[in-house]
Amino acid sequence: METKLDPVVRQLADHLSFLGYEAEEREGKNHPYLYLRHQRNPNFMIDTFLGAVKCTVYWGLSPEGLAGSLEMFTLLNELNRQALGFNIYTDEDSLILELVIPREYSKASFGAFWSVVESDFRLVMDGRLGPFLS
């Protein structure tokens, strides 16, 4: 079966599989994307958008998160200051982490880049956001 998955996204999937991620190709509105799972890290999507490759994590918001408290937004501002790769924000019902992945793939540079991504995952998953997530 021939895939329409972006070749760079395919390379990233192969690399992430080596790091313990399970990649599943899914059909999006306009083109396929990857959905990735890991035992210790959040599930996320890798997709293309306007020629860029992006990684997106979605978490549902709890009733406290949906209320949009000053405490939550203060914490999000703090996390955005500390995060090295992700932009962290909310929409109507989700907390979203989003970053652009370099299109030029090399094993060494992507490995270093991904260690920054996993550092941001740990930062966000440290428990402080717990009351705001469903």
PLM features: what roles do these ranges have?
Residues 18, 125-134:
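Charge-rich, low-complexity terminal tails
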Residues 30-34, 53, 95:
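Hydrophobic residues embedded in beta-strands of well-ordered beta-sheets
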Residues 85-113, 126-130:
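Well-ordered alpha/beta subsegment
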Residues 5, 9, 65-69, 110:
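Generic alpha-helical secondary structure
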Residues 56-96:
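Short, internal acidic amphipathic alpha-helical interface segments
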Residues 1-43, 81-90:
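Charge-rich, low-complexity N-terminal segments
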Residues 37-66:
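Long, continuous compositionally biased terminal/linker segments
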